[in-house]
Structures are given as structure tokens and as C-alpha cells.
């Protein structure tokens, strides 16, 4: 079994109407992607911004007649005219195997590797983090995660205490523990991230007591109970907006002689983030 793929170029004002039209004609899936490499960062709460130029792709069963579908779509969209439509046949394949083949071991710095569980570790004597793509952000493929991992690989983390604020999959915390840290505390506002962090910790034969993870409210409660003390190093690979907003709060979690590693920042946001943390 294969699929018929329909693709067209559109704009933000037309996209919702065309989506509805395709859904009415029994599309199986619809995807919108950026047609011009235009970044959209940190939308306001409740907003779902789209790019100025969009490529819309829809999948249909391979039993449809593309010519009939085009005719019906144009008829239902009349008197307006649809953008040019392109069709192609997608052959069926082992999608899970294809996905696995595209996720290979990655090296960060001199000694650190991220390896999927189905792959052979290229350097068994190196520090290998076993990690599969899953519920939460963080596999090493994102540039900001890669930067953080490479930086961690260069540090002396022996017996240090860390906080990973926005821990996602737990990748940075696990790397720190395998590089010698004594304890990492993970914080994330997504319950699935906490589940993923715990699972990945166990997959790497690490004791969960050395990587406790909390939702932000529970983390604050632990601080108020004085169960959490200022740490040697705080990692925060999130976004510039939250980093600036939380500057005083995050800085207070670090010892006076400690360090803060901030990432997830665009080049033109760096100065604003630096200014927010300058008092500390």
C-alpha cells in the first residue's frame, strides 16, 4: 500500500481554508512547513504563527483518482482559485527502519557519544549515552543541545552538583553524571519530560536518586523545604524569553563561585540575556 501526496504553496491567510477543504475530501494527514527558511520563535501565549510562505502537503489513499480530486477541489473552492497542485505516489516502506537508519551515533567533544539503543557504539571505551528519540526534547541533533554537550565534555565535573532547568529528555543531566557529576536535579514543566528523563537515566544504569526530576512547583517546594541547596553549575537550554524572565530566580540557585550555562539563544538575543544576568 502506498499513498497519494498532494503538495501546494500557500500563505497564512489561505492555509486554514485550504486545510479544511482537504479534510472535507478525506485527506489522511496534512503538514505545513516553512517554504523560505523564516524562523518563528517564542510566540505569545495562545498564538500559532505561520510563516509568510508555506508548503502544504496532504496525504490521500492511493485508491483516489488525482484528476477527479483536483476537479472536485477546484469545484468546491470556486469562485476562488487554488494554487497549482502537484501529485506524487509515495511507495510504502518500512518507516520504522527508515527512521532508525537516519538516527546514528553522534560525537560531542573528545569523549562523549550519543548512541541509539539499536546501534553499535563506535568507541566502546568512550562515554556513551544510550538514548532513543522519544517523548521529550533532547537527542543531540539540535544545535543548542550539541553546543551544551560539547561544552560539558570539556569541563571537570567530578563530584559537582548541577541543576538542569528545562531538562527535556535528560540528555544534559545524564551526560554530566557520566562525566563525573555527583548529582543533577532536573526541572521541566512537561510531565512527559520527567518520565523520559527517568527512563533514560535507568537505560544508562544511573541511580535515580542522583537525578531527581521535578515539575517547577514541586521544585520550588523542595527549595522552600531546604531540600535543595545552591549548586556548582546550572544548565538552562530553553529560550531567551524565559531565561531573561527567570534570571534572578536561576542565579539564586547557584553558589557564589558557581557557573551558569545558558543556551537556546539566537545571536541577536545574546546581549539581552547577558544584560539580564550581569548583576550576578
Which residues make up each language-model segment?
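N-terminal auxiliary segments of SAM/dcSAM-dependent transferases
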Residues: 2-123
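Surface-exposed loop/turn positions
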Residues: 110-112, 160, 258
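A short, charged helix-loop
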Residues: 127-133
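Conserved SAM/SAH cofactor-binding pocket of Class I
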Residues: 135-218, 227
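S-adenosylmethionine
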Residues: 155, 189-280
Amino acid at each position: 500500500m502506498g499513498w497519494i501526496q498532494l503538495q501546494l504553496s500557500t500563505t497564512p491567510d489561505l492555509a486554514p481554508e485550504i486545510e479544511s477543504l482537504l479534510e472535507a475530501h478525506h485527506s489522511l494527514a496534512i503538514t505545513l512547513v516553512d517554504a523560505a527558511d523564516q524562523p518563528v520563535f517564542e510566540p505569545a501565549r495562545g498564538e500559532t504563527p505561520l510563516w509568510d510562505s508555506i508548503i502544504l502537503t496532504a496525504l490521500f489513499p492511493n485508491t483516489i483518482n488525482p484528476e477527479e480530486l483536483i476537479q472536485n477541489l477546484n469545484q468546491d473552492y470556486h469562485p476562488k482559485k487554488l494554487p497549482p497542485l502537484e501529485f506524487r505516489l509515495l511507495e510504502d516502506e518500512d518507516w520504522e527502519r527508515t527512521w532508525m537508519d537516519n538516527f546514528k551515533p553522534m560525537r560531542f567533544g573528545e569523549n562523549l557519544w550519543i548512541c541509539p539503543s539499536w546501534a553499535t557504539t563506535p568507541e566502546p571505551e568512550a562515554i556513551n549515552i544510550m538514548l532513543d528519540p522519544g517523548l521529550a526534547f533532547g537527542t543531540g541533533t539540535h544545535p543548542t543541545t550539541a553546543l551544551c554537550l560539547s561544552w560539558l565534555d570539556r569541563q571537570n565535573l567530578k563530584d559537582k552538583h548541577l541543576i538542569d532547568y528545562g531538562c527535556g529528555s535528560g540528555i544534559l543531566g545524564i551526560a554530566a553524571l557520566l562525566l563525573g557529576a555527583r548529582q543533577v536535579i532536573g526541572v521541566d514543566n512537561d510531565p512527559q519530560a520527567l518520565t523520559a528523563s527517568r527512563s533514560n537515566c535507568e537505560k544508562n544504569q544511573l541511580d535515580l536518586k542522583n537525578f531527581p526530576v521535578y515539575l517547577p512547583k514541586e521544585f520550588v517546594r523542595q527549595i522552600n523545604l531546604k531540600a535543595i541547596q545552591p549548586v556548582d553549575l546550572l544548565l538552562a537550554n530553553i529560550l531567551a524569553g524565559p531565561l531573561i524572565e527567570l534570571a534572578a530566580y536561576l542565579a539564586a540557585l547557584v553558589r557564589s563561585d558557581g557557573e551558569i550555562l545558558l543556551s537556546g539563544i539566537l545571536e541577536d538575543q545574546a546581549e539581552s540575556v547577558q544584560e539580564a544576568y550581569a548583576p550576578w
